[in-house]
Structures are given as structure tokens and as C-alpha cells.
């Protein structure tokens, strides 16, 4: 009876569609954003008389970014109510076009575990630990960031060397592992690789300094270099680091999680309204990448002429970098360390709640324990992980505007990572203790399952919608493919609504690996209609029995002869139930 009532409801709702134009036109969905097109940028001469055509460097003060997002932005938002609406860069298929921010990778085509484990490192040079002594020249100290480091130049290529600090092997592994997950998901993330090397390879350029997040600038001399190396992992005489290959192009500063870049005419969507940035909260929660401040991003000017990086035309590309905080980064204050991922460092709501309750109510962070099998990962764990409650170090403007459909989009991508993918990527961390690798794989799989169970519950997880050569309308139910819910939960049903008629139930066939197919009906007279006739439009609604909302697929029947069944998918919606 409940099923019949729901069908009757959709019948009444859809009957009203006949008087209006279909919501999706018969045209190919946007699959490539215009921000990848090269633009001409004004040039200027530097002090050496050389032309520089890249946009001006944006400086992002560490203290200001924190103060702005903790104090000033919340106050501004409180007095100027701007409720978050739908993301502004979504195409007709409820997906994202490839852009300078995001490229569809594992979410649009299968990737092997090896491909995921390679990440961005498949392109470009790599360091050789067998190089001669003194051939790795240190030419710059590492500015900002939670972990110590310095820049090295070898054979014309630059690398940022990042070291462990306290939690031996965690930070160096984290940045290499997380970068591969982000890259496979679709973000631009660097080639970060764990490396063991001998001290004699390094040659220090005199007069270098380090600009830390807080405190005074300090010299980078031989003494300080040795002190830094003492904090990182060792295997006999070899030191452990993460080598982060220098990004291509000309660095023009971090990107912001709100607003637009004034000197980039292709940057047309407010960053807080980009689905790729909103939905990035799913990846961050999975990995506990709490340090999502803008200083851990970078934008680069990508000239059309790779031999002249500072020339025009070109475009601005956006990167997520410095992921060493993932998997339980330690803070000096244990009380703050325990809260990371559960509360902002300065959380107005939690402070007020603690004040009212006098701290008598047990919070999730109060239950935190360090697992002896994963001691280097601190409080990174599965118990008490609640996706809706996860928080970064301080408020992130894009994360704060994430809607259910943005989260569902990010979760559909997360679901593509199989256990084999995760094992292959974690193995890149090169842990000395096998228990650490086992713990991290286990925790990632558990947290992934929690995220899938939460965000596949409200909106349909059916993806990869396509029309087969036989004329069937098929998709892949990612919830069933990943065994997110019990097998008995999945009970498929569907209705078809022609633009000019009443809805009818249609048969649904479910196959292995989450496959779902509908045998679409032949419309005998549709071939007589004009190509733009609205009556060629039809709507399929598919429920999987596990998710509250249906998958809504808009099709155009472009049949040109009697007896044909030639549907084209023109739009996809995932409404709430």
C-alpha cells in the first residue's frame, strides 16, 4: 500500500509537467570548464628587465586566515544571512566538468590499484638516492607548515623535503598517501614520495633561513639541518623524508575557500559555491585532514609555452598540498590533539556548551585512546567518527556551505576506492612496522564504510547512468556494489513518465557489481515528432529500497523511424525522499 501511495504521489506531481518545458534541453552535458582555456594576461618587467605575465602572487598570512575564519567571517555571516544554495558548477548529469580545480578520474573510469598508487608521480622526474655526494643542493628553507623541511634541487628539478616530527613515519607517510587519494579522486595534488637517503647527498647553500608559522625567522645552517634530521625516521645510516616534487608553472599563491580571484577572469564561481571544494569535506573527514586552511593550497600559472613558464597565454591551476596532518597529527597540547576532527581549535559552540554544562557532559574526544597497533597515528580512529559532526581545525567557508547533494557527490567518488586501492596506496607509506600499515588500512576501510552508510541513505547512490546498445537504461548502484547495506535492503522499483502521459511501472533487473537496468518502452509515434518537440521527453524514477530518494533520469527519445528505441540521457537529479 505504501508503495502504491508513493507512485500515486509521483503521478500527480508529474502530470503537471506536461504544460511546461522540460528542465533539460537536448544537448550534450558540459564536460569541460572554460577555465581550462588559455587567456592572455598582462605582462610587466621585473627588476632584471624580464617579462612576467603570471598573475600577481597572493600572500596569505597564517594568523589572518585563522582569525578571519574563527572570528570575523562568522560575525559577518551572522549579520548578513546568506543561506547556502545549490553548488554553481554542476552539469546536467549532477557531476562536475573537468576544470582547473578538478578532473574526473576514478569517479568516471576504472583505475587499477597501481594507477591510484602512482598518483601524480607518473608525470615528471624522480630523485635517485644513488646520486653522487653533494648533488642534492639545499637552496631554500620550508616556510609555514606543521612539519620541518627544506627545498632541494637536483638535475634541474626542485623538491620540497618534509621530515617527521615526533610521530616517526606518520607525517612523511601521510602526505604521500593522502596526495594519491586526492589525486585519484580528481583534485590536483602533488607528487609526494617517501624516500630514504644518506646525509652526504645534501649540500647546503649558505645564508638560508626558515620562516615558521609562528615565531622568529631562524637560520638554516649545518647545525640546524642536523637537528632537523634527528627528528625524522631512520633506517641505519639513511634518513627518511617525503620528497614533494615542485609544482609545474609559476606559483601565484594559495587559493581561498571563499570569493574569487580578481586577476583571473576565468575564476567566475565563488569558491564557497564550488561543489569540488564543498564536497572535499568528505575526503578531509575520511583522512582527518583537519588542517584545511588556505595556506595548504597553491595556485599556479600554467603557460601554453612550457619552456617559458612566465609567458602568456595560459590559465591558473589549483592544487591541494601539504597533507602531512592526516591520520592523527600530534599537537603539543594533548587536550587540543584529542579534539582534532571533533571540534574547531576555537569553537564558539563547544565553548558555550562546556560553559553551560560546566564540562560535566562527556564528549567524543574525552573517549579518545591511542591504539598500540597504530600508536604513531595518535587519536585517528573509527570509534566516535560521525560524518555530520566532523570539523576541521577552524571553520572552512566551503565546507560550511556543503549541501546533501555535494556530500553525496563526494561519497560516490569515495566509494570507488576498493580495498585493493586502499592497500596499494597505504603501502606507498613504506612503514617499518607492518602493524602500522595494517592499522591504517583497517581504519580507512572502517571510516569509508561509515561515510558511505551516512551519505548513501538520503540521496540515490546509483551512478554511471547509460543507455546500452539494446536500448536499456542502466546504472551502477554504488551502495549495493560496496555492500553498504544488507543485501535484503535493496528492493528496486521504477516508474516511467512520458511528457504527455500517465506514469507507469517498469521492470527493473539487478545484476552483479551493483548493475541496475530498465527495459525502456518503445514509443510508436515518437519518430513523427519534430526534433525539439517536448513530447519526446520522458522521465524515469528508480528507487533502490535502501536510499530515501530516487534517481531521476531525464531522457529524450530521438528515434527517427518506426519501431526504434533511441533514448539519450539529458539530465539527472537526485532529490530527497
Describe each model-derived feature in a short phrase.
Residues 17-19:
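N-terminal Sec signal peptide cleavage junction
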Residues 1-8:
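Bacterial N-terminal signal peptides that target proteins for export
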Amino acid at each position: 500500500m505504501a508503495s502504491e501511495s508513493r507512485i500515486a504521489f509521483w503521478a500527480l506531481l508529474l502530470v503537471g509537467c506536461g504544460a511546461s518545458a522540460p528542465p533539460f534541453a537536448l544537448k550534450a552535458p558540459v564536460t569541460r570548464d572554460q577555465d581550462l582555456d588559455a587567456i592572455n594576461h598582462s605582462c610587466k618587467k621585473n627588476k632584471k628587465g624580464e617579462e612576467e605575465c603570471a598573475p600577481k602572487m597572493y600572500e596569505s598570512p597564517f594568523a589572518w586566515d585563522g582569525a578571519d575564519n574563527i572570528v570575523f567571517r562568522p560575525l559577518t555571516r551572522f549579520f548578513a544571512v546568506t543561506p547556502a544554495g545549490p553548488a554553481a558548477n554542476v552539469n546536467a548529469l549532477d557531476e562536475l566538468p573537468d576544470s582547473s580545480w578538478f578532473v574526473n578520474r576514478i569517479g568516471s573510469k576504472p583505475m587499477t590499484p597501481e594507477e591510484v598508487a602512482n598518483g601524480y608521480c607518473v608525470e615528471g622526474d624522480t630523485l635517485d638516492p644513488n646520486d653522487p655526494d653533494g648533488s642534492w643542493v639545499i637552496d631554500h628553507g620550508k616556510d609555514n607548515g606543521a612539519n620541518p623541511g627544506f627545498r632541494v634541487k637536483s638535475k634541474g628539478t626542485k623538491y620540497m623535503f618534509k621530515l617527521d616530527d615526533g610521530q616517526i613515519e606518520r607525517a612523511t607517510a601521510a602526505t604521500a598517501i593522502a596526495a594519491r587519494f586526492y589525486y585519484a579522486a580528481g583534485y590536483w595534488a602533488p607528487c609526494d614520495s617517501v624516500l630514504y637517503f644518506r646525509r652526504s647527498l645534501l649540500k647546503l647553500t649558505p645564508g638560508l633561513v626558515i620562516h615558521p608559522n609562528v615565531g622568529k625567522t631562524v637560520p638554516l645552517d649545518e647545525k640546524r639541518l642536523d637537528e632537523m634530521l634527528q627528528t625524522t625516521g631512520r633506517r641505519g645510516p639513511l634518513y627518511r623524508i617525503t620528497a614533494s616534487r615542485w609544482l609545474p608553472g609559476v606559483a601565484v599563491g594559495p587559493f581561498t575557500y571563499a570569493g574569487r580571484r580578481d586577476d583571473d577572469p576565468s575564476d567566475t564561481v565563488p569558491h564557497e559555491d564550488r561543489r569540488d571544494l564543498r564536497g572535499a569535506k568528505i575526503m578531509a573527514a575520511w583522512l582527518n585532514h583537519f588542517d584545511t586552511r588556505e595556506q595548504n593550497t597553491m595556485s599556479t600559472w600554467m603557460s601554453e609555452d612550457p619552456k617559458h613558464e612566465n609567458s602568456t597565454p595560459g590559465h591558473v591551476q589549483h592544487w591541494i598540498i601539504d597533507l602531512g596532518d592526516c591520520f592523527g597529527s600530534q599537537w603539543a597540547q594533548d587536550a587540543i590533539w584529542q579534539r582534532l576532527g571533533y571540534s574547531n581549535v576555537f569553537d564558539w559552540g563547544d565553548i558555550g556548551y562546556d560553559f553551560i554544562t560546566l564540562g560535566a557532559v562527556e564528549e567524543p574526544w574525552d573517549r579518545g585512546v591511542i591504539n598500540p597497533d597504530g600508536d604513531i597515528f595518535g587519536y585517528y580512529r573509527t570509534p566516535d567518527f560521525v560524518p555530520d559532526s566532523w570539523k576541521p581545525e577552524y571553520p572552512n567557508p566551503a565546507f560550511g556551505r556543503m549541501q546533501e547533494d555535494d556530500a553525496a557527490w563526494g561519497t560516490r567518488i569515495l566509494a570507488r576506492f576498493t580495498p585493493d586501492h586502499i592497500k596499494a596506496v597505504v603501502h606507498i607509506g613504506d612503514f617499518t612496522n607492518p602493524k602500522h600499515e595494517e592499522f591504517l588500512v583497517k581504519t580507512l576501510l572502517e571510516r569509508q564504510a561509515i561515510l558511505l552508510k551516512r551519505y548513501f541513505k538520503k540521496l540515490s547512490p546509483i551512478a554511471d547512468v547509460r543507455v546500452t546498445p539494446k536500448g536499456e537504461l542502466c546504472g551502477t548502484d554504488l551502495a549495493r556494489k560496496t555492500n553498504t547495506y544488507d543485501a535484503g535492503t535493496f528492493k528496486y522499483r521504477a516508474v516511467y513518465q512520458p511528457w504527455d502521459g500517465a506514469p507507469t511501472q517498469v521492470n527493473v533487473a539487478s545484476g552483479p557489481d551493483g548493475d541496475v537496468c530498465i527495459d525502456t518502452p518503445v514509443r510508436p509515434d515518437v519518430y513523427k515528432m519534430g526534433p525539439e518537440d517536448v513530447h519526446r521527453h520522458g522521465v524515469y524514477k528508480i528507487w533502490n529500497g535502501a536510499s530515501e530518494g530516487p534517481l531521476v533520469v531525464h531522457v529524450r527519445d530521438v528515434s527517427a523511424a518506426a519501431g526504434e528505441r533511441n533514448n539519450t540521457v539529458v539530465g539527472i537529479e537526485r532529490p530527497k525522499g
